[in-house]
Amino acid sequence: MNKQAIQSIVAEVVQQLSQTTKQSNTVPMAVSARHCHLSIEDVEALFGAGYELTKKSDLSQPGQFAANETVTIVGPKGSIEKVRVLGPARSITQVEVSKTDSIKLGAVPPLRESGDIKNSEAITLVGPKGSIYKKEGLIIARAHIHMTPDDAEAYGVKNGQCVRITSQGERPTTLERVLIRVSPKFKLEMHIDTDEANAGLISTGDTGILSLYEEAL
């Protein structure tokens, strides 16, 4: 085998390895519109005693679903109707909106990891059978990636770590400090809100490339 043939083979192998590495760092993306999670007590307060959420469609994360039920959320300066409830019911009530939504409401919710609502913004929810005022619970959710422990090992990351994601599309956009969330119950998927999606022309089903920071954030 001559030198030129060897160089050609080496170049091909390097290219294949590069493509494999790139593919291994690819993460599916999904756009999450405004929605709310309700406690059992608040489900009953909004929809009636003994009421249970009914499934409209399954979500990508196992066991989670979009309910048929919707509510109106009310802030100091405005309201938004038909905000989808996600099920099943949780231990606490939480409303997730985009920055654009918050401006319409006249509210100033903090950027938080889902579930971290302590000292967050107040919000009123209105349902067909009643309304409730929550002194905290309105947040803008941080961009995050759900993954299993096996996924985390493959990507070389751990729960609570932050990474960088660059979308692949007409308007490549880099999202910084994307939170890693690891659980055996999760399915690999990155979640961003509608503001982030609109800025990068990103749609559910698009992919991004994960890269690590030199130092943990």
UniProtKB/Swiss-Prot annotation:
Free-text remark on how the cofactor is bound: There are 2 Zn(2+) ions per monomer; Zn(2+) and CoA bind inbetween the 2 domains in each monomer.
Binding site for Zn(2+) 2: 144, 146, 191
Pathway: Polyol metabolism; 1,2-propanediol degradation
GO biological processes: propanediol catabolic process
Protein location: Bacterial microcompartment
GO terms for MF: acyltransferase activity, transferring groups other than amino-acyl groups; metal ion binding
Tagged with keyword Glycoprotein: no
Cofactor(s), by name: Zn(2+)
One Pfam family recorded for the sequence: PTAC
Residues where Zn(2+) 1 binds: 35, 37, 96
Keywords tagged on the record: Acyltransferase, Bacterial microcompartment, Metal-binding, Transferase, Zinc
Gene Ontology terms: cellular component: bacterial microcompartment
Keyword Cell wall biogenesis/degradation annotated: no
Known catalytic reactions: propanoyl-CoA + phosphate = propanoyl phosphate + CoA
Family assignment from sequence similarity: Belongs to the PduL family.
Domain comment in the entry: Formed by 2 beta-barrels, each is capped on both ends by short alpha-helices.
Function of the protein: Involved in 1,2-propanediol (1,2-PD) utilization within the bacterial microcompartment (BMC) dedicated to 1,2-PD degradation by catalyzing the conversion of propanoyl-CoA to propanoyl-phosphate.
Official protein name in the record: Phosphate propanoyltransferase
Annotated organism of origin: Priestia megaterium (strain DSM 319 / IMG 1521)
